[in-house]
């Protein structure tokens, strides 16, 4: 299930006693082919937040929300950093940023939007639900 996958992905980055992550996951099953690239994307986002973003300071946090739009048949992932130092557009794109922007989304014919707001990084990914949802046989 997605909630457990997200909790497992962020666990190595959590500091005991601090509420660094708020997760609002959709209870869906992600297929194994989609789970690894999603976790790799989250790993890169966490690494960047620890090095440059909200998780560099004690009061910083990351909100992770997902939702399914049944009508459009899409899965939406949103990462929002808050309470960290002001951020700006990076002067160059690292391999990690390339992975975030192109890895998960492009593998499943989706799209990624990265915004470097003064209040923190926001990453939104949309992919077709059918490409990532595990199908349970009846």
Predicted regions and their residues:
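Glycine-rich nucleotide-binding loop
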Residues: 85, 117-124
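Short beta-to-alpha transition helix within the HATPase_c
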Residues: 1-12, 65-67
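Short beta-strand element(s) in the Bergerat
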Residues: 19, 73-77, 121
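Short beta-strand patches within cytosolic ATPase/nucleotide-binding catalytic cores
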Residues: 22, 63-65, 113-115, 124
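Short beta-strand/loop element within the Bergerat-fold HATPase_c
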Residues: 59-72, 80-81
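Conserved short strand/loop->alpha-helix "switch" segment adjacent to the catalytic nucleotide/phosphoryl-transfer site
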Residues: 14-60, 91
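C-terminal end segment of the histidine kinase catalytic
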Residues: 127-138
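ATP phosphate-binding glycine-rich loop and adjacent ATP-lid/helix-beta elements
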Residues: 87-113
């Amino acid at each position: 299930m997605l909630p457990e996958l997200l909790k497992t992905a962020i666990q190595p980055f959590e500091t005991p006693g601090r509420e660094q992550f708020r997760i609002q996951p959709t209870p869906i099953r992600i297929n194994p082919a989609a789970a690894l690239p999603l976790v790799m994307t989250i790993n890169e986002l966490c690494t960047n937040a620890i090095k440059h973003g909200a998780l560099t300071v004690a009061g910083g946090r990351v909100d992770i929300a997902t939702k399914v739009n049944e009508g459009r048949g899409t899965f939406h992932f949103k990462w929002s950093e808050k309470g960290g130092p002001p951020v700006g557009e990076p002067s160059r794109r690292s391999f990690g940023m390339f992975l975030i922007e192109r890895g998960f989304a492009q593998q499943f014919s989706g799209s990624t939007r990265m915004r470097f707001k003064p209040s923190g990084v926001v990453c939104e990914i949309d992919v077709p639900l059918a490409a990532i949802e595990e199908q349970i046989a009846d």
